[in-house]
Amino acid sequence: MGPRGAASLPRGPGPRRLLLPVVLPLLLLLLLAPPGSGAGASRPPHLVFLLADDLGWNDVGFHGSRIRTPHLDALAAGGVLLDNYYTQPLCTPSRSQLLTGRYQIRTGLQHQIIWPCQPSCVPLDEKLLPQLLKEAGYTTHMVGKWHLGMYRKECLPTRRGFDTYFGYLLGSEDYYSHERCTLIDALNVTRCALDFRDGEEVATGYKNMYSTNIFTKRAIALITNHPPEKPLFLYLALQSVHEPLQVPEEYLKPYDFIQDKNRHHYAGMVSLMDEAVGNVTAALKSSGLWNNTVFIFSTDNGGQTLAGGNNWPLRGRKWSLWEGGVRGVGFVASPLLKQKGVKNRELIHISDWLPTLVKLARGHTNGTKPLDGFDVWKTISEGSPSPRIELLHNIDPNFVDSSPCPRNSMAPAKDDSSLPEYSAFNTSVHAAIRHGNWKLLTGYPGCGYWFPPPSQYNVSEIPSSDPPTKTLWLFDIDRDPEERHDLSREYPHIVTKLLSRLQFYHKHSVPVYFPAQDPRCDPKATGVWGPWM
């Protein structure tokens, strides 16, 4: 109201003045109320995402493993255990879908991983999760494994939305020396070099220090020094429990009963990782952040049985589209959950975290390309039905099995799509899709053995009876999570429907981007892996 209107007001005590004694105390109460005391009054939650590397389905106590994981078990028991949760079968694809909210067929990363000398990274026109959270007012930190490309500085974590970064850029390295050795084909030389960064600078002085301990210490420092009133996003991508199988001696002793050497060392690595998780959550509590924190734990893919991991009783392993390669170990722990101590059976995928976390942060996804992920917070927190009814595991026309079965009993076969009812999609292509309870696999999905836990059974693997020419499977995953009973002949109409869905995704996918090695990656001159273009 302008000055003229103000002058026309009555001079006596009007209704507004009479309300002041009532309204002012109410306003003070609202301002002084503790966070979370009323609907819409609390601050956006702190978000802590802890990603384990190569952790298998049967490698945690809450799935019945003999490996002791008391901290993970307690968090899962007091939170929401995700029992129908999926990742990708490999490192780079899972990490890219976590941070983009988009299937790898959208980014050209549907084939294998990004290798050290490939001039590749998550496309620079993709808007990543940390960028969206920064826009929502968050401080964003990353600690640990990047593995989303580093050939240009523009690909580095600090150029993709993270305020700080501490970790390694490639897919694996020595836990103590922090060096990675790689064959550079064009030069016919294997080069070993340091891969450790603090921000964009090379981080030295950490030799002979175990990486999980270093990363945990940095994460705790970030938590301890963080002002509670500022929303925090911490992405802690541990090296554990990816090979090489290295761990301090004291973590091996509790598992001397395990005779298999790989499994023995792997068990110790899992225990150390579990201890790290306990230390991080303890820091969140002692710093006063826990009561307003959403803590998410996830693996990036199934366990690698060749390096101590185990996915029993699920079929397959890392690199495969069988459940053992893609069914993820995961849970959410938080005082903010409306239901706790439950097992959630709703369908959730790693691409769902981006829209879920951005919504929790009260941000928006403006500027992103069309998302494949869904906001699943109500599904997790309240037990509501998942908005996701379909999940594309992958389509990779160039698939090469880098982790073949012993004696390699299966191999890519000829296309079965000559059959009229299967004409929608080339069934020789490595692909898999989930719709409701149904899962369809085509081509060669990867090693299809079942691998019992070492030292607990008299067999090291249980081969499949499938003929090597087979290129099509249909399973009811709800009733048959171990993928033992192929129903493709019994339900041809389901097969036809899912093949048409695969064809739809294939039609709307971008070409595979898997460039040849660039010899300019050679770190000989500097002794350090890093950007070269």
From Swiss-Prot:
Positions of the catalytic residues: 91, 147
What's an example GO BP annotation here?
Answer: autophagy
Post-translational modification here is noted as: The conversion to 3-oxoalanine (also known as C-formylglycine, FGly), of a serine or cysteine residue in prokaryotes and of a cysteine residue in eukaryotes, is critical for catalytic activity. This post-translational modification is severely defective in multiple sulfatase deficiency (MSD).
Coiled-coil zones: none
Q: Which cysteines are joined by disulfide bonds?
A: 117-521, 121-155, 181-192, 405-447
Residues listed as glycosylation sites in the UniProt record:
188, 279, 291, 366, 426, 458
Q: Give the consequence of mutating residue 521 to Y.
A: In MPS6; severe form; severe reduction of activity
Co-factor binding comment: Binds 1 Ca(2+) ion per subunit.
GO terms assigned for molecular function: arylsulfatase activity; metal ion binding; N-acetylgalactosamine-4-sulfatase activity
Gene Ontology CC terms = azurophil granule lumen; cell surface; endoplasmic reticulum lumen; extracellular exosome; extracellular region; ficolin-1-rich granule lumen; lysosomal lumen; lysosome
Its domain of life reads Eukaryota
Please write the reaction equations for the catalytic activity of this protein.
Hydrolysis of the 4-sulfate groups of the N-acetyl-D-galactosamine 4-sulfate units of chondroitin sulfate and dermatan sulfate
Record localization: Lysosome; Cell surface
Q: Quick one: effect of changing residue 498 to P?
A: In MPS6; mild/severe form
Q: How does it assemble?
A: Monomer.
Q: Family assignment?
A: Belongs to the sulfatase family.
Protein name per Swiss-Prot or TrEMBL: Arylsulfatase B
Which species does this protein come from? Homo sapiens (Human)
State which gene encodes it.
ARSB
